[in-house]
Regions:
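Positively charged, polar, low-complexity stretches
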Residues: 2-9, 17-121
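Structured mid-domain segments that build the active-site/substrate or prosthetic-cofactor binding neighborhood
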Residues: 12
Length: 121
């Protein structure tokens, strides 16, 4: 995807939903994005992508983690050069919003379906 090509590969902010190709995701504005980044600061990665890459098991683990926590981190131990494409694939399959990629860690958010279960937005 073209929007993943950035000069600063250390940090990446996902586009807003006006440019997004995933129509069922919620729109996150810059203030909400900053709030999610602050909330994710103390969170440890719950999913680690290793030598096997993004498998169905990884997708299922990300989906279950998003249901339980809404906001998660994914760490890339392998495939560091392809982290943007892999994160894009995970976001598409799990219907999640990419908050930011910092280094080899991606922060993903998916709002809970029930309003009483929502923790962040």
């Amino acid at each position: 995807m073209d929007y993943f090509k950035t000069k600063n590969k250390k940090s990446h902010i996902a586009p807003n939903s006006k440019n997004s190709y995933i129509k069922s995701m919620i729109e996150i504005n810059s203030k909400q994005r900053k709030l999610l980044e602050k909330a994710a600061h103390d969170i440890q990665p719950v999913v680690i992508v290793g030598g096997a890459g993004v498998t169905d098991g990884v997708i299922q683990m990300v989906d279950n983690s998003l249901i339980a926590h809404e906001l998660i981190k994914i760490k890339y131990n392998e495939y560091k050069d392809e982290k943007f494409e892999l994160t894009d694939e995970i976001c598409q399959k799990c219907d999640a919003n990419l908050v930011r990629i910092i280094g080899n860690v991606a922060i993903l958010f998916r709002q809970a379906e029930k309003e009483e279960d929502r923790k962040y937005l």
